[in-house]
Amino acid sequence: MNRPLRFIIATPICDGHDVAAAAITRILRGEGVEAVYIGFNKTAYQIAKAASEEDATAIAISTYNGGHMAFLKELVKALKQQALGNIPIFVGGGGTILEKEIRPLMKLGITKVYRPPLDLLDAVRDMIGIVNDHSFSQSSSQSFASQTLGQKLTSIGLSPKHSLHGDQWPDLPRVWGFGGRGGAGKSTLIDELVLRFLITTKGSIAVVSADPTLGDRLRMIHCYNPRVFMRSVRVGPGENTTEKLQSIISELTNHQFSLILVESVGLGQNELGVSSIVDASIFCMTPEYGTDIQLEKEALLATSEIVVMNKRDFPQSEARSRRVKQFIKPSQKFFLTEAKHFGDPGVNSLFDELATLSNLNTNSSLLPTSNFVEAIPFNRRNYLGEIVDVHQNYYASFENLAPEQLNDIQAEFKQIWDYYGFDGDMSNLRIENGIAFKQVDNTEIPIAKKTTTGIWVPTIGMPQKNASINEIVRYLSRQNIPGSFPYTEGAYLYRRKDQDPIRMFAGLGLPETTNYRFHLLAKGHGSPRLSTAFDSLTLYGLDSDEAGASAKVGEGGVAVDSIEDMLRLYDGFDLENTSVSLTMNGPAPTIMAMYLAAAKRKGFNWKKLRGTIQTDIFKELQAQNEAQFPLEPSLRLIADMIEYMMIAVPSWYPISISGYHIGEAGANPVQELAFTLANGLTYVEILKSRGLDVEEFTKKFSFFFTSGSELEFNVLGRVARRIWAVALREYYGVKGSGAALKFHSQTSGRSLQDTEPLHNLTRVALQAEHALHNNTNSLHTNSYKETYTTPEEDDVLLAMGSQQIPLVESGDFGYIENLNQGSYGLSYLEDAVESAVHRIFNEINMQGGVIPAIENEYFRTAIQEEVQKERKALRNGERKIIGLNYLPSNSSTRPRGELVQISTQDKKNQINRTKFFKQTNKEKAKASLKELQAVATSDGNVFEALIKTVEYATVGQITSALAEVWGKFRPSM
């Protein structure tokens, strides 16, 4: 019997670009291959361990953020250590893998490298063909006794006669089976039990997971410990779980495992799962089980030794648990748990019982404890649906206005016209330097400007003075002048002339290297606006000396491990007169604390510091994956930081709700807008429930959107401002500037093509125009080379030109502040996009809001569906990309220029500096980290404690210390 193909799919350490990896997994499954996706941010050791335990026939690696040469070398070495030196390894990474690197990679041991413009489906079919033709067979070429455990389990699955029932281990481990409906949280519960086993014992544990999609390993974040063995078993529709698992479990009992946990597939009501082939069973359920009659039908509920009701955060869980207890026997144990919460007391109690029944020698005093509070009260979970209702009521209120209301609106419009209206009459105007000023209430207002051809045009465009009342009502309710509610055309009345919207993204290698680039970009600009890109190690809360990660040091951004790195990074800048953007999310509070501590050392006044830091954890869980901790403590830390900075650093924006990375993950423009605004409104709910003043903290919000090529990007900023304004004023009662949404834009990285990259210059210029016409508050324009390298200095200056030429050379933005406002086409598109956003709000509301929707995989599912749709459109030619699938030149040559790479010596220097900092501050760091943990497990402000901790501890040390008391982020698919 031929074994089925089994692929391990992963992305390397500090690489969260999982869109392609997830797509490959889906395609492999569609082609009938067993695909085990183990996730993103995986070390070479973790990939090799998974490949060994799963007895994979091939490995597929998707790598997109550099460092692949060194990483793949480590992977080949790790595979040889696992006796997998012959396993086929396939690698893809867009333009980041260069053509000249293919031969060295294949010489290293990589089977094949895939590059654009090859379609993913073609690549997958090619991989399958290569593996089918491959003479390699890890299992069949060896005797059963000499095979690894992973290979033995494969052999047993193919020929059950190999199953050993020997008595060489008289004290057999206790085998526990876990059954229950799909979605009960069995995988998370098992993983948390594994953690407690590792903490309290010195033994080893095996986990067997039966699943049609082989997807459970993704959530098992503790399975990579050397004392854990995990095997996934595919049980398809109609297949017998017991037959598939019996011989495998029997074989595992012949190895020195102290405990074996077996997860069954999701069960129907009359099914007993694996209960007949294990020593004892645990039935997992949730409070959402239906009626009591349903309980009587649950076969495993009546026969299991332990009953677990997971998802205790369900509002009726206590009442529901009392009902369930009436249906179980006195001999059955019952536990109410919340497995997703690190240190959950219910899971601790469950583990104690399981350990006792399994005769494990444990130390319960070492069990983690926590007491997380829900970020949003249950009675507030309909906020998005209520906001949609508020929007609809707002527009409906203008449909049947009373005469006195119409008179008020007419008077309001007349006042606006008297201030800013221009009808061509130049009398009574003062003219200076091509600007006509009107005297109103002792104030001179610039109402017209003279073009290069001598035509006078209004500074603010608006309806004619004698416009109909219907036109005026629509104008004031949906548009209005820039800087006035509902802020459709802009958060401010005028574009700033003393400060261009340029905020170029820079970061590379060592802090001093990036510092040099900053000074280059700031040259000629009176008030510099710096945007800082960090390397992937920093983004994942790791240090440059992290084991197995040297390839990532300084790649794609600057390496910042300590406060000393932060001092080097901004050396020579007057931070009180510099606006600094920090592109950081997971470890954002740590980086922000380092920035403040460094500024304090330099003598800068915190109250004069200006800038933005992203801090948005929602989009990490929805799209980008740079998260370190579970959601609840992450939100607590963010709220601590916002609360602290509102007072201590009042001119700083402590959170930038980001849609850009959602778009980069594959969301369409409407999804990006809707998800981002929903996230922003969720932060409002979180901070409001904390007792903070909505009027004040919303002033500190900023947003970050893509500016792409699709039609909807013509109005994305306009619609964002309008939806936000109506929600904030009409629903939350905000009267001040918090209702005026401010946002940064970046041209679409996803739209850039590695094939014929010079076309990217045109793409970026088009997208810059979209952003500027949306009146973005700041803008980063990508370099045309960014699909395959970090931009050189000339590339950055060229990218800056794509926004400077429209601003300086064209007249689009120098005369009329709202040039396109009132266009019939744009107005229709605005309304259509707004309605589409409302529909998505309602979908999220049906999930219970953003947080439950994250847990239910709503966002990732929606994004992946969009990715599949786009991939299909590109494949069949429905969507045309110049140079890729339409009008290709068939030239593979790239523009000349050196590829920007970080020298090995620079990486070594950074690693050595970090090690020296740690050694120098060893004792002080130990004490400060202990104090930080004490605050993190109490009610204190963790961010305030961080500001002290960063004086002596590194980013990685802080991440590890908080993970010990808060737990680690658990991905899902």
Regions from the language model: what does each represent?
Residues 14-16, 21-123:
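Cofactor-cradling patches in redox/metallo enzymes
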Residues 35-39, 62-64, 227-243, 286-289, ...:
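Flexible beta-alpha connector loops of hexameric P-loop NTPases
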Residues 52, 138, 360-539, 803-804, ...:
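Flexible, glycine-rich loop/tail regions that form catalytic "lids" or insertion modules at the edges
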Residues 65-67, 441-708, 712-713, 731, ...:
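Catalytic alpha/beta active-site cores
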Residues 104-126, 302-361:
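Canonical P-loop GTPase G-domain recognition
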Residues 121-175:
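Extreme N-terminal, non-catalytic leader segments
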Residues 158, 162-173, 179-184, 188-270, ...:
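Nucleotide-state-sensitive switch-loop elements of NTP-binding domains
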Residues 221, 267-332:
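Conserved C-terminal guanine-recognition region of P-loop GTPase G domains, centered on the G4
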